[in-house]
């Protein structure tokens, strides 16, 4: 059994985001069916009251603040010096595998959130996992960091090595935690129990966070990047038309995106054929070489792809010039 605790709503305190956007984000995150959502005190004050019958965890900076929030049953805190309170999950950071020896002296609560361990894949991680479970007798919320861009792989290894894994994520790897969208898709691709219909909200969540924080995600970021389903190469387009699994492990629609054929210097006849079909353009295949040549020349001149409007203009120009040429030839023959 794999449980996901998402902390996206506790990663936004450094941004000035209006309450309406925060509420919309919360509702979209709830649609992803995570087991729990972590929320910061600042965000909670902006969007309260929370929906009933949902599982929220409140992140507090001081253990003394717990009594201010009787409506919460679970808390997470980095500075805990009290033992025996089952409401509290103590989070502590292990920046490297070399800090394993300090583990025993720092476990003072029954539930532990372990963050960090970016470099664990460089070591014998299976034995390290066993040691962690032997030292930490209680439940472990595992929160590998993503500074080395392999947190999803670490989380998946932990999940497969545990009977009841609890993994902490953030959407888009905010604050360098396990990317929620990558973990959900990894579980889906490995046929783990998950509701794939939740994935269609990824693009909406991405757009909402980008608009609210004014910080865009990388265009080629796994799962949610805006350009990951853009295809320019003629060979790739031809392969996708025959069998999309040649280049795409899943359909773009599954994650709320669409495949887009990009015309440029790497395009081929297959690209033009599919683009004309998408734009409902009809013309003789004899004109494709001329059109393709102009597409490549324009792309090189712009140092960018050719837009649909520019492509339509090229098609119209080539068609018109060939019509004029054909008419002139007939006149000469006459």
Protein language model regions, located:
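Terminal or standalone catalytic/regulatory effector modules within metabolic enzymes
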Residues: 1, 6, 28-64, 252-334
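N-terminal small/glycine-rich loop or linker at the start of catalytic domains
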Residues: 1-17, 131-138
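Active-site pocket-lining/capping segments in soluble small-molecule metabolic enzymes
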Residues: 3-6, 58-63, 81-82, 92-95, ...
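Hydrophobic alpha-helical scaffolding
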Residues: 15, 148, 173, 195, ...
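General structural feature for long, well-ordered alpha-helical segments within catalytic domains
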Residues: 21-25, 124-128, 151-154, 179, ...
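Active-site beta->alpha loop and helix N-cap motifs at the rims of alpha/beta catalytic domains
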Residues: 23, 31-123
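Surface-exposed amphipathic alpha-helices with a cationic face
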Residues: 27-30, 47-53, 70, 84-86, ...
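Catalytic alpha/beta core domains of metabolic enzymes, predominantly
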Residues: 117-241, 245
